Design a protein with these regions (language model features):
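Active-site-lining helix/loop region of Rossmann-like oxidoreductase modules
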Residues: 1-80, 84-88, 107, 114
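C-terminal helical cap and adjacent loop that interface with cofactors, partners, or active-site loops
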Residues: 81-152
Length: 152
C-alpha cells in the first residue's frame, strides 16, 4: 500500500469487455486504488490475525475508461476483510435517459462463481484452437440439462 504501485485489478479487464460488447472504442483507462479500513478491531480467521482499528483491511480499485463515443465506464471492486455489518453486494448504476440502478444484497457469490465457470465449458470447447481473449467468447449461457446438449 505504501508504494502506491498496484497491478491492474480484475475490473481493468471488465471495462474492456464491456466496451467490446457495447461496440465502444476505449481511448484511455486509469485505475485508482484506495485502502479500506474499519473503525474497530477485526478478527480474521482466514488471516489468523486481528486487524487493528484504522489499519488497512483491504482495497477498493476504481477503473475509469473513457471512450471515443463520449461514454464513460467506471467500475469498482472492493476486496477486504469484512466487519460484522458487511456482506457481499453488487450495485450497478447506468446514468443517462433513463437512469437505472440495480442493487443485489447478499448474492450467492460462491454459487454464482461456480455456475459461471461450469456454464462457460461449452464455449471453451467450441472455441478456436490457440490463445484467444475472453471478449471473443460468446455470452455465457445458463445450462439446465446435460453439458453435452450444449456442444452442438
Amino acid at each position: 500500500m505504501e508504494s502506491g504501485e498496484y497491478v491492474p485489478s480484475y475490473m481493468w479487464n471488465q471495462n474492456g469487455w464491456l466496451c467490446e460488447r457495447l461496440g465502444l472504442t476505449p481511448v484511455s483507462q486509469v485505475q485508482q486504488c484506495f485502502p479500506t479500513t474499519h473503525s474497530t478491531d477485526l478478527v480474521s480467521s482466514t488471516l489468523g490475525m486481528t486487524i487493528r482499528a484504522g489499519d488497512p483491511t483491504g482495497m477498493s480499485a476504481v477503473v475509469t475508461t473513457e471512450t471515443k463515443e463520449g461514454i464513460t465506464i467506471e467500475t469498482e471492486c472492493i476486496g477486504k476483510v469484512y466487519g460484522p455489518e458487511d456482506f457481499d453486494r453488487n450495485d450497478w448504476s447506468f446514468y443517462g435517459e433513463p437512469e437505472v440502478s440495480i442493487h443485489v444484497d447478499r448474492p450467492a457469490t460462491v454459487e454464482l462463481t461456480c455456475a459461471n465457470l461450469i456454464n462457460r465449458i461449452p464455449a471453451l470447447i467450441r472455441s478456436e484452437p490457440g490463445y484467444i481473449t475472453t471478449d471473443k467468447l460468446p455470452n455465457n449461457r445458463y445450462i439446465v440439462g446435460k453439458i453435452t446438449d450444449y456442444l452442438d
